[in-house]
Amino acid sequence: MTSKSTAGAPVPERTATPALPVRPGRLLLFAGHAGTGKTTLAKRAVALLKARSGQDYFFLDKDTAYGAFSSHIMGLLTGNPDDRDSPTYLNHLRDKEYAGLLDIARENLLPGMSVMLVGPFTREIMAGKFFRPTELGMPAGTECRIAWIDLDSAEAKRRIEQRNDARDAWKLAHWDEYLKRRVEPPQDPALMRLDNTRFDEAAFGRLVDHLMGKSLP
């Protein structure tokens, strides 16, 4: 089929280029409770993953993506911009933030970009959703691996106090209440735990192998 140009000459109509099927990227998650060192280890891991595979990763950290936004909203709601642990935050803002992170992850996975996601995601992991990524809205065929970073509560508290982040104030002031939210993750082949009490190069190497899929059949 043809159409006429403004000069009157026939111009062939363009046909849309068919979209090629794209395999979704891989979703890697560094999870665990506060103060365990998730972000530090995730940054170290993503550098190793890129060096080993040559693949780029979209790095998505919860605090970077939503830190300033949450401070503004909580300041309006409670007068405390540093609140990240009170019932007000957990009941009214927490799920919206996590949904936004998952939306961003999905948009990058769809065209084939792999994603390194950093955040607690405790509810989602305990519900088993990261073991079935389509339940999180991820593209069909998305492969997910989880690094759960462990640290005993006393050492976690020491590190939280040491980092002196105002966003931890509510948590520290209500420590016993916060401890009730600490859970043991479910067992699944997609999840590997790492004790970060003292950095262990060999154990970290095994974790990176797991993230690359080497530990699963």
Where are these regions (language model features)?
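Walker A/P-loop
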Residues: 39
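Conserved substrate/cofactor phosphate-moiety recognition/catalytic segment
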Residues: 46-96
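Extreme N-terminal, non-catalytic leader segments
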Residues: 1-27
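Hydrophobic anchor at the beta1->P-loop junction of P-loop NTPases
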Residues: 30
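Conserved phosphate-donor/acceptor-positioning beta-strand/loop module used by diverse small-molecule
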Residues: 139-160
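Glycine-rich phosphate-binding loop used to anchor ATP phosphates in small-molecule kinases
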Residues: 89-140
